[in-house]
């Protein structure tokens, strides 16, 4: 049976979702979970785009040992050199290099001839092979490229030393039959195509990214590039979890398997959703809240008699827990530590003690802690960047039905250690809090989106707030978790501003939006 390699690009193409900017600790948390998930390759970022991305890729490459870590590079020596410096300490350094090949890109973006592009592609693959043991070459906009020219340039980069050739549907244009045909054509017409791995990379502009990826596998693709929850540029990318489960459930049809640990899918999906602030639609295949719900009376009757009447995927297969065991104020440190280990957290004794003390303090207000509560609490602490921006100290809100809401906020400037305290009013309590935060930070911040959800049912559930803001023409997303909605709202807003400041500090040179090469 064929083995399909999974190339995960959540940390590169997924992070290009508008309003998403992950800090190094958040990227590292996702990378470690992707390693547990069993991906074969993870694309950690675009090292040449900014010092922040470079440092994150370098840290991930040093940490991850059980899969190959790669970075994106344009077909220029500076990008390749930067990627090598970031990736050279990894277990299996790999480069993902790209250049556009379609006539529309050549004419309007690159302003080069086919001959010039072919020459540049070959020269840069050769240059990359002087450093990297594995080089993947991508033909940006392959699906709108003249097929004879595509076969020619693929032949030449293979001769130059490329180990993997990626044929991306960069704009999500093709139907599955058309995309599959490209793989057949390249296999039949590109010289030595059988000596390299062919890779698929699909965008979801017409809603066919997963179908196209599976069509590529049917027609000889050895590797599939995908993203957790299908997030990414514009309408997103092919969803890793959907492809992996489809290969497993329909192994009889695809005759292919992978190393993906399916029982880690739900945990990975939840982590990416929390850290990016991008909620998973309830009706999302495999990981949505409704994926295993049965509403129709006829369906319920059949399901109760025999699950397989209406359920082709069991919740347990993808790691959906049906037992929500909880911790409470009488739970001891041993039970707390055991629960953290079961949730996949590998923490030292000092960290366990720190989180246990926070947990015990909160149980005075909150009767029960579910898995979701603990995950939210720990992620909030572990992924916070404490070096740049503002630290939340306290919040007080005065509200009455016949009064104008007033908020008082105390923050600490993490650069100067100065404590800032301001007060302001608003039409509602949340607006009062946000007007006060603006005063504290003296920044013009426009709120674009505000969402609130609870971890679970019950009046003592944690509130999770996600916001998107605009600062100096740049979008930034933030999240906040607290038992109080207003506190969570303040933390989310502050988190979005801090992310913007981190991005502003680290972004010199290319913006991450320049990295749309595949």
From Swiss-Prot:
Designated name of the protein: 2-isopropylmalate synthase
This enzyme's EC code(s): 2.3.3.13
Residue intervals of the Pyruvate carboxyltransferase domain: 4-266
Presence of the UniProt keyword Ribonucleoprotein in the record: no
Subunit structure and binding partners: Homodimer.
Record CDD domains: DRE_TIM_IPMS (cd07940)
Gene3D superfamilies: 1.10.238.260, 3.30.160.270, Aldolase class I
Annotated gene: leuA
Signal peptide residue numbers: none
Domain of life: Bacteria
Listed pathway(s): Amino-acid biosynthesis; L-leucine biosynthesis; L-leucine from 3-methyl-2-oxobutanoate: step 1/4
Lineage start: Bacteria, Bacillati, Bacillota, Bacilli, Bacillales
GO molecular function: 2-isopropylmalate synthase activity; acetyl-CoA C-acetyltransferase activity; manganese ion binding
Family affiliation: Belongs to the alpha-IPM synthase/homocitrate synthase family. LeuA type 1 subfamily.
Binding residue positions for Mn(2+): 13, 201, 203, 237
Enzyme class: transferase
Reported cofactor(s): Mn(2+)
């Amino acid at each position: 049976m064929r083995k399909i390699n999974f190339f995960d690009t959540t940390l590169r193409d997924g992070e290009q979702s508008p309003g998403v900017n992950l800090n190094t600790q958040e990227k590292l948390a996702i990378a470690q979970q992707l390693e547990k998930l069993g991906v074969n390759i993870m694309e950690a970022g675009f090292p040449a785009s900014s010092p922040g991305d470079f440092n994150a890729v370098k840290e991930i490459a040093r940490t991850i040992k059980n899969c190959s870590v790669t970075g994106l590079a344009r077909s220029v020596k500076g990008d390749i050199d930067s990627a090598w410096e970031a990736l050279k300490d990894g277990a299996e350094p790999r480069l993902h290099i790209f250049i556009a090949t379609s006539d529309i890109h050549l004419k309007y973006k690159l302003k080069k001839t086919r001959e010039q592009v072919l020459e540049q592609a070959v020269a840069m693959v050769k240059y990359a092979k002087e450093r990297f043991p594995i080089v993947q070459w991508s033909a940006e906009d392959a699906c709108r490229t003249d097929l004879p020219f595509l076969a020619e340039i693929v032949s030449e980069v293979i001769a130059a030393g490329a180990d993997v050739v990626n044929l991306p549907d960069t704009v999500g244009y093709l139907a599955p039959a058309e995309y599959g045909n490209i793989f057949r054509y390249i296999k039949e017409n590109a010289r030595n195509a059988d000596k390299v791995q062919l890779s698929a990379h699909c965008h979801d502009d017409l809603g066919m990214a997963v179908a196209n990826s599976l069509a590529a596998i049917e027609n000889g693709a050895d590797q599939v590039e995908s993203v957790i929850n299908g997030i990414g540029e514009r309408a997103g990318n092919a969803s890793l979890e959907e492809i992996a489960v489809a290969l497993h459930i329909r192994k009889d049809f695809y005759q292919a398997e992978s190393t993906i640990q399916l029982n880690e899918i739900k945990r990975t999906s939840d982590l990416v959703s929390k850290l990016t602030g991008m909620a998973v639609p309830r009706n999302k295949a495999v990981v949505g809240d409704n994926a295993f719900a049965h509403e129709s009376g006829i369906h319920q009757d059949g399901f109760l008699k025999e699950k397989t009447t209406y359920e082709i995927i069991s919740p347990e297969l993808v790691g959906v827990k049906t037992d929500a065991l909880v911790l409470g104020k009488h739970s001891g440190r041993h039970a707390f530590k055991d629960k953290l280990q079961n949730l996949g957290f590998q923490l030292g004794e000092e960290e366990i003690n720190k989180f246990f003390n926070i947990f015990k303090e909160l149980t005075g207000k909150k009767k029960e802690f579910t898995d979701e509560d603990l995950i939210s609490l720990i992620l909030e602490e572990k992924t916070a960047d404490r070096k740049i921006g503002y630290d939340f100290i306290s919040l007080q809100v005065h509200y009455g039905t016949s009064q104008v809401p007033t908020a008082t906020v105390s923050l600490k400037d993490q650069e100067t250690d100065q404590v800032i305290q301001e007060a302001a009013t608003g039409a509602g309590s949340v607006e009062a809090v946000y007007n006060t935060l603006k005063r504290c930070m003296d920044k013009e911040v426009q709120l674009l989106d505000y969402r609130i959800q609870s971890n679970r049912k019950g009046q003592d559930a944690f509130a999770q707030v996600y916001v998107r803001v605009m600062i100096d023409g740049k979008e930034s997303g933030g999240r906040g978790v607290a038992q109080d909605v207003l506190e969570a709202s303040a933390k989310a807003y502050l988190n979005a501003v801090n992310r913007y400041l981190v991005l502003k500090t680290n972004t010199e040179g290319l913006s991450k939006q320049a990295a749309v090469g595949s």
